A protein has these predicted regions:
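Structural motif
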Residues: 156, 208-212, 235
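Short acidic low-complexity segments
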Residues: 193-204
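Residues in the short beta-alpha loop(s) of Rossmann-like NAD(P)-binding domains
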Residues: 161, 181, 240
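Short, conserved loop/helix-junction motifs that constitute active-site signature segments
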Residues: 150, 168-171, 203-204, 225-231
Length: 297
């Protein structure tokens, strides 16, 4: 699953600047404020880069996940290239989280993936409760299964999100899929495929906009949200989007569907063995839906 990168068509303003990486920067500041004086003392205890997901465990016991962007690093097939992609391999343990948070804005997608997993791990302690001002959390809930699809509305999906595509096909009406690699789509989905270059034309027409969380990894989410029309229902899903929701909700996101790590060591062991969500959901991580309860500011 790949996600579009921002281009000039995304620069329509929705009340906030679509600065690349702004959501992550705001979320880090929110976490720093909530955690307080102990923030800078937190270190990374374990890192696992699996086939499907990258996971971390922090010194405070929290764990976090991120999508592993394997397709984005085809050059990492020899030792020098691999070293550039992940120069800290073998030296992750004990590093301060500041190193990983700085890497969120590095050119290497693998460094960014580990950094996002750290942000999700830092967020976990605040997402274990059922609610917080401005939002409510539903543990064990798959946001994709519970999306209310408008019968006649215009639906746009960014990324090859299989569960929602199945439901849209059952609806039997046109929809749009924005996906960088159309080879990830099935034959009956290809007629609805839209090239990334047309994202700026298609997104503003969406009544329901469902976005893969990998857009956060590639710093394209802000531009996409800035392009959505006022009043559109926006759903962001995937393990990558498993962090404090405030910065997302301020930009019009209605629901976030992510994963909450409950047993970090067990989860990382599964990732080491090439495991996917089917192997850890309900065991070492729970799916969750984070719903906005107040209007976007």
């Amino acid at each position: 699953m790949n996600s579009p990168s921002p281009n000039g068509a995304f620069q329509k303003n929705r009340g906030m600047s679509p600065e690349e990486g702004a959501i992550l920067k705001e979320t880090i500041e929110e976490l720093r404020s909530r955690i307080g004086d102990t923030f800078d003392g937190i270190t990374v205890e374990r890192v696992t880069i699996g086939i499907f997901f990258t996971g971390v465990k922090l010194s405070n016991g929290s764990g976090g996940l991120c999508f592993t962007p394997i397709k984005e690093i085809p050059e990492a097939v020899c030792c020098p290239s691999s070293l550039r992609a992940l120069p800290w391999s073998g030296k992750f343990r004990g590093r301060p989280i500041a190193d990983f948070l700085d890497a969120l804005f590095d050119r290497s997608p693998m460094k960014r993936a580990v950094g996002i997993a750290v942000v999700n791990a830092l967020s976990a302690q605040f997402l274990e409760c059922n609610s917080s001002p401005g939002f409510v959390i539903e543990r064990g809930s798959d946001a994709l299964d519970e999306i209310e699809i408008p019968d006649d509305g215009n639906v746009v999906v960014i990324g090859a999100l299989v569960p929602i595509l199945k439901r849209l096909k059952m609806r039997g009406k046109p929809y749009s899929i924005i996906e960088m690699d159309p080879r990830t789509l099935k034959a009956d989905e290809l007629p609805f495929w839209v090239s990334v270059e047309k994202t700026g034309e298609v997104v503003p027409r969406a009544d329901l906009l469902v976005i893969t969380g990998t857009t956060l990894l590639f710093h394209s989410l802000e531009a996409i949200l800035a392009c959505a029309k006022p009043g559109a229902k926006v759903v962001l899903v995937g393990p990558t989007a498993s962090m404090l929701p405030d910065a997302f909700f301020r930009r019009g996101v209605s629901v976030m569907g992510g994963d909450l790590v409950t047993r970090p060591d067990e989860l990382l062991d599964i990732l080491c063995e090439g495991g996917s969500g089917y192997h850890f959901f309900g065991k070492s991580a729970d799916q969750m839906a984070i719903r906005r309860t107040e209007p976007a500011s």
